[in-house]
């Protein structure tokens, strides 16, 4: 497989279930670190039953602060066949999951689409990505009902510095608008769980208050009906010795400024977190459960 899926278009030759030589480090077959019921997503995704979450390894971004560093950078996980992936979807459904939640699926969309051709459970499928999704990728994502995309940066310099992706702002905003045009609006069931729709996540970073305010403005102008999730759970991970300015938690003042601005924005659907929402308890064990 010569890969040009993600916006990096590195042209890597991804083979079978070995280690890939492309930017994401992924082989052709999906590498999974965990597949289990998960309760740590937004309330309209995670309920008392849990979200059937599949954590894919490797990543087309290289965020220096990634809290899933163990799998995004170090490729911890196990390669599975398309048939096995379909079986995992079925097992999660039979375990009572309210949805199938695909975390960081961008670089495996071809295999995922094939797996859903074998078996697609009668529950919503959540495409949960970092937002660095090309149109070529999204054209393959006909299986998704809910799009949960990050909008990490609107500042090209910060995107380059912390994720080595200067084009991230344009790629992510275009991806969000494409997903918005597909779903057209949000649909919830009688329990408040999203059946169809768009959630935009923004992780507030140290010294990132102005960026967060810009994200709020962008959402208000372009997709005011989307659910906006303003996250305070930034937890410094990985080696941040070269980035001391983000090697800390965000402050109460930083988060408070963002929340005050959001409250005045007029956006109706906003999720927030307690400032205490951080630490290893927000990082699931990547122990190959369910793989």
Region locations from a protein language model:
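Auxiliary Fe-S-binding modules of radical SAM enzymes
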Residues: 1-19, 185-291
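Conserved Radical SAM active-site core
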Residues: 20, 24-147, 155-157
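Hydrophobic faces of well-ordered beta-strands that scaffold small-molecule active sites
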Residues: 52, 100, 125-127, 147-149, ...
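Conserved radical SAM core fold
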Residues: 72, 109, 132-134, 151-169, ...
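Conserved glycine-rich "GG(E/T)P / GGGxP" loop and the immediately following alpha-helix
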Residues: 93-118, 160-161, 167-168, 174-177, ...
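Alpha-helix-loop-beta-strand connector modules within alpha/beta enzyme cores
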Residues: 114-124, 174-179, 252-258
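Short low-complexity, flexible loop/linker segments enriched in glycine and/or proline
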Residues: 116-117, 141-142, 163-166, 284-289
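Aromatic-anchored, glycine/proline-accented short structural segments
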Residues: 134-192
């Amino acid at each position: 497989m010569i890969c040009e899926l993600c916006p990096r278009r590195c042209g890597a030759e991804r083979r079978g279930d070995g280690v890939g030589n492309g930017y994401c480090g992924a082989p052709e077959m999906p590498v999974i670190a965990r597949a289990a019921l998960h309760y740590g997503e937004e309330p309209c995704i995670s309920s008392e039953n849990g979200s059937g979450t599949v954590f894919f390894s490797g990543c087309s971004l290289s965020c220096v602060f990634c809290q899933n560093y163990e799998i995004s950078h170090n490729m911890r996980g196990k390669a599975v066949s398309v048939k096995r992936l379909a079986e995992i979807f079925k097992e999660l459904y039979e375990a009572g999951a309210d949805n199938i939640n695909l975390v960081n699926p961008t670089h495996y969309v071809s295999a995922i689409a094939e797996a859903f051709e074998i078996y697609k459970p009668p529950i919503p499928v959540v495409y949960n990505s970092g937002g660095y999704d090309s149109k070529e990728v999204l054209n393959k994502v006909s299986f998704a009902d809910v799009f949960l995309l990050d909008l990490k940066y609107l500042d090209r310099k910060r995107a380059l510095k912390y994720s080595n992706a200067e084009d991230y702002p344009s790629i992510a905003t275009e991806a969000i608008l494409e997903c918005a045009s597909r779903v057209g609006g949000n649909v919830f069931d009688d329990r408040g769980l999203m059946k169809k729709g768009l959630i935009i996540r923004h992780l507030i970073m140290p010294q990132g208050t102005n960026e967060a305010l810009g994200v709020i403005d962008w959402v208000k102008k372009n997709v005011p009906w989307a659910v906006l999730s303003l996250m305070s759970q930034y937890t410094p991970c990985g080696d941040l010795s070269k980035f001391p300015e983000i090697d800390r938690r965000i402050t109460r003042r930083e988060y408070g400024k963002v929340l005050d601005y959001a409250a005045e924005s007029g956006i109706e659907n906003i999720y927030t977190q307690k400032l205490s929402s951080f630490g290893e308890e927000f990082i699931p064990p990547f122990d190959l459960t369910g793989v």
